């Protein structure tokens, strides 16, 4: 679902990066909030997936009473609700601002720097750092350390296959998100502290291009996840191979029928 949110946002992100925002101030705020909702929800969902794999392999008996469809839906809805709550302050940070010319607008961080805006920037910095990265990464490391220790000890190949997809999704998500996280951290620090050191840092790093590049990498994750499911998931691979075998078999049957018709027509002649 978080991948669908990012795919839906791509046209709006393009308009924003081209400094040709034509959708008004309200939609600017909505798209900005949705961007962070997608970020937090992605991290929370893959964290829940890692915890689920941890209990399934390390504590399979303890997990059984809690592995129900109702609890799964409740946990996912809680992750999305928490993502929305954490992202809602972003609506105060982004504005539809005239850029260069009065006829051209840009959906970007507001130029205002009052106490409320400064507090929200610090709040988002803390949220992204602690809730968006540090806590999920600690959970990932602990869960997969215990999982691999258990799999190696039990020498259970089937359980190793069951965690392979989840681990690949987690690793790809981290690789795609970490560059954007670093750039956003630098941008937040630059916007909060306007000393000469950070002004020169902003000048030399050219944060606008860095943010665009890191956002492109983060959006690439939406394309990588289906490839992971296709290449690693045995169920998906078996379905694809069965479809391909059916197509191949149908083509062979058609060729045989065509050759028989050709031979019969030649005999008649």
Swiss-Prot record:
GO molecular-function term, one example from the UniProt record: C-C chemokine receptor activity
Family annotation (InterPro entries): CCR1-9-like, GPCR_Rhodpsn, GPCR_Rhodpsn_7TM
Pfam families: 7tm_1
Domain of life: Viruses
Spans traversing the lipid bilayer: 30-50, 71-91, 123-143, 165-185, 200-220
Bridged cysteine pairs (disulfide): 28-107
UniProt keyword Transmembrane, yes or no: yes
PROSITE patterns for this protein: G_PROTEIN_RECEP_F1_1, G_PROTEIN_RECEP_F1_2
GO biological process, one term: immune response
Keyword Transport: no
Keywords in alphabetical order: Disulfide bond, G-protein coupled receptor, Host cell membrane, Host membrane, Membrane, Receptor, Transducer, Transmembrane, Transmembrane helix
Membrane protein topology class: Multi-pass membrane protein
A GO cellular-component term linked to this record: host cell plasma membrane
Subcellular localization, as worded in the UniProt entry: Host cell membrane
Main localization, broad class: host cell
Family membership noted in the UniProt record: Belongs to the G-protein coupled receptor 1 family.
Stated name of the protein: G-protein coupled receptor homolog C3
